Amino acid sequence: MLLLPSAAEGQGTAITHALTSASSVCQVEPVGRWFEAFVKRRNRNASTSFQELEDKKELSEESEDEELQLEEFPMLKTLDPKDWKNQDHYAVLGLGHVRYTATQRQIKAAHKAMVLKHHPDKRKAAGEPIKEGDNDYFTCITKAYEMLSDPVKRRAFNSVDPTFDNSVPSKSEAKDNFFQVFSPVFERNSRWSNKKNVPKLGDMNSSFEDVDAFYSFWYNFDSWREFSYLDEEEKEKAECRDERKWIEKQNRATRAQRKKEEMNRIRTLVDNAYSCDPRIKKFKEEEKAKKEAEKKAKAEARRKEQEAKEKQRQAELEAVRLAKEKEEEEVRQQALLAKKEKDIQKKAIKKERQKLRNSCKSWNHFSDNEADRVKMMEEVEKLCDRLELASLQGLNEILASSTREVGKAALEKQIEEVNEQMRREKEEADARMRQASKNAEKSTGGSGSGSKNWSEDDLQLLIKAVNLFPAGTNSRWEVIANYMNIHSSSGVKRTAKDVISKAKSLQKLDPHQKDDINKKAFDKFKKEHGVASQADSAAPSERFEGPCIDSTPWTTEEQKLLEQALKTYPVNTPERWEKIAEAVPGRTKKDCMRRYKELVEMVKAKKAAQEQVLNASRARK
């Protein structure tokens, strides 16, 4: 039934009768706020009471927005629209008293109120003067709403809120009233945290866990504060892509620097608070007392345990000492017995050798002229060096119990056997040397002037160079070859392959062949320097055993001690070499001086040879 209002005075009421048509079926689509509420409840699977609570919440927010009182900004009309970036946007909209806590509804309501009050059209209608374009102060209101209505831009402005206190209390300020000074500082800085439920500073009754959680949170503070609002250049003003990239790069660098300064400020705040916190001092004292008590208890338990172990250890040490003394005594007796046997053997050999010399001397060395006598003396000395004790005793018995002819025959037979043995050894060594030379020639191709004509001087020079440039020298064989080419008098140029081949063949030589090489070199030395060979034709010389110069090679440890001593005692140190010798056990002053000279000569020779190799390589380049 449709009810219409009654007609006004002076108007007539007309009744129109229309013919009603037959009923028809039509589709009706539900709309309206009540249907919307029904759909929300169904989608949330909520009851009507829940929806009523939601509606009440929205109504309460709207009522709060309506109750919000805006503060008039007295400097609003004096603001420069061109300098809008330096204005306080909250104060412009009248929200200076709520600032970052203002909701979007409040910001929107504040903007609406400011528009209704300060819109240029309304002021123009009221007769107020209006500036043209964007020069009117109303532009500042528009910019403020533009910044605060956008969550990203609002976050950027909140990060540089001009009313925020960035100061950090010093240690002296909080010496007596720590909680009153630092509590509000941490409270206002907690707004920058990305994490919710920021822990409070607490009081003197806070537990260790709460205090530790508080400082752990702030030492690992995760701040959302950023400084894009302070960018000096706006990339939107760039004329080209390159300029926009340059502006973005400059802005990123500036933001990163300001972010670093902000984190340093937070770190300084936490450091100052931690150093002044009386609870930290209390916890440290409690921890120290606890550790001291535990330490004393452990020390007492350790002392008792140590006493028991010490008694057992002393008993074990005594048993070990007795066993060791017994073992050492046995070893000493064995060594003494071995030394006695060795001395007896040595004396017996020496006695038999002297007896052989005397027997031969008594028979005038079985010779009638001086030349044969000298030759026989050499052969006798050879027998003394080569024969064993049993052979010497047997030969001496024959000489002592036989006639001159029988003794001479026995002596000559023994000499012949020794010479034959030496000859065989030499032939075997020569065969090995020839085989080694053939192998070396095969490995080097069997040609080249460097693989032949190795004189005695070149062999000695090679041995000297190998000793002078030990393994580990950079380009060792090239350096050795260059050294030989510089110092060799043969004029034959040697390559690194020639030197390597000859060095390998020398390593395979028999010891007697090495002695022959050294002997030939010494004979040449005597010939060049005019050293006359001296021989006593009257009697064989006697050899006396006495102290000789220590030719023991220097070990790595001794070398290190020598080098350290040379650094410790400089040249101007009085009695320098005596002190150096004391620092190197087992070495005399002469040993240290001789080793030092060898090292100096070795370094000089290495430098010279390496310079030659370097110059040669540069010349080839």
Curated annotation (Swiss-Prot):
<feature type="modified residue" description="Phosphoserine">
    <location>
        <position position="49"/>
    </location>
</feature>
<dbReference type="InterPro" id="IPR042569">
    <property type="entry name" value="RAC_head_sf"/>
</dbReference>
<dbReference type="GO" id="GO:0051083">
    <property type="term" value="P:'de novo' cotranslational protein folding"/>
</dbReference>
<dbReference type="GO" id="GO:2000279">
    <property type="term" value="P:negative regulation of DNA biosynthetic process"/>
</dbReference>
<feature type="domain" description="SANT 2">
    <location>
        <begin position="549"/>
        <end position="604"/>
    </location>
</feature>
<dbReference type="Pfam" id="PF16717">
    <property type="entry name" value="RAC_head"/>
</dbReference>
<keyword id="KW-0156">Chromatin regulator</keyword>
<dbReference type="InterPro" id="IPR009057">
    <property type="entry name" value="Homeodomain-like_sf"/>
</dbReference>
<keyword id="KW-0677">Repeat</keyword>
<dbReference type="Pfam" id="PF21884">
    <property type="entry name" value="ZUO1-like_ZHD"/>
</dbReference>
<keyword id="KW-0805">Transcription regulation</keyword>
<dbReference type="GO" id="GO:0006260">
    <property type="term" value="P:DNA replication"/>
</dbReference>
<dbReference type="GO" id="GO:0061649">
    <property type="term" value="F:ubiquitin-modified histone reader activity"/>
</dbReference>
<dbReference type="InterPro" id="IPR054076">
    <property type="entry name" value="ZUO1-like_ZHD"/>
</dbReference>
<comment type="subunit">
    <text>Component of ribosome-associated complex (RAC), a heterodimer composed of Hsp70/DnaK-type chaperone HSPA14 and Hsp40/DnaJ-type chaperone DNAJC2. Interacts (via ZRF1-UBD region) with ID1.</text>
</comment>
<dbReference type="InterPro" id="IPR017930">
    <property type="entry name" value="Myb_dom"/>
</dbReference>
<feature type="region of interest" description="Disordered">
    <location>
        <begin position="422"/>
        <end position="453"/>
    </location>
</feature>
<feature type="modified residue" description="Phosphoserine">
    <location>
        <position position="47"/>
    </location>
</feature>
<feature type="modified residue" description="N-acetylmethionine">
    <location>
        <position position="1"/>
    </location>
</feature>
<feature type="domain" description="J">
    <location>
        <begin position="88"/>
        <end position="161"/>
    </location>
</feature>
<dbReference type="GO" id="GO:0003682">
    <property type="term" value="F:chromatin binding"/>
</dbReference>
<dbReference type="GO" id="GO:0045893">
    <property type="term" value="P:positive regulation of DNA-templated transcription"/>
</dbReference>
<feature type="modified residue" description="Phosphoserine">
    <location>
        <position position="63"/>
    </location>
</feature>
<keyword id="KW-0010">Activator</keyword>
<dbReference type="InterPro" id="IPR044634">
    <property type="entry name" value="Zuotin/DnaJC2"/>
</dbReference>
<feature type="region of interest" description="ZRF1-UBD">
    <location>
        <begin position="160"/>
        <end position="250"/>
    </location>
</feature>
<dbReference type="GO" id="GO:0030544">
    <property type="term" value="F:Hsp70 protein binding"/>
</dbReference>
<feature type="modified residue" description="Phosphoserine">
    <location>
        <position position="183"/>
    </location>
</feature>
<dbReference type="GO" id="GO:0031965">
    <property type="term" value="C:nuclear membrane"/>
</dbReference>
<dbReference type="InterPro" id="IPR018253">
    <property type="entry name" value="DnaJ_domain_CS"/>
</dbReference>
<keyword id="KW-0007">Acetylation</keyword>
<keyword id="KW-0597">Phosphoprotein</keyword>
<dbReference type="InterPro" id="IPR032003">
    <property type="entry name" value="RAC_head"/>
</dbReference>
<keyword id="KW-0143">Chaperone</keyword>
<feature type="compositionally biased region" description="Basic and acidic residues">
    <location>
        <begin position="422"/>
        <end position="433"/>
    </location>
</feature>
<feature type="domain" description="SANT 1">
    <location>
        <begin position="449"/>
        <end position="511"/>
    </location>
</feature>
<dbReference type="GO" id="GO:0005730">
    <property type="term" value="C:nucleolus"/>
</dbReference>
<dbReference type="Pfam" id="PF00226">
    <property type="entry name" value="DnaJ"/>
</dbReference>
<dbReference type="GO" id="GO:0006450">
    <property type="term" value="P:regulation of translational fidelity"/>
</dbReference>
<dbReference type="InterPro" id="IPR017884">
    <property type="entry name" value="SANT_dom"/>
</dbReference>
<dbReference type="GO" id="GO:0042393">
    <property type="term" value="F:histone binding"/>
</dbReference>
<dbReference type="InterPro" id="IPR001005">
    <property type="entry name" value="SANT/Myb"/>
</dbReference>
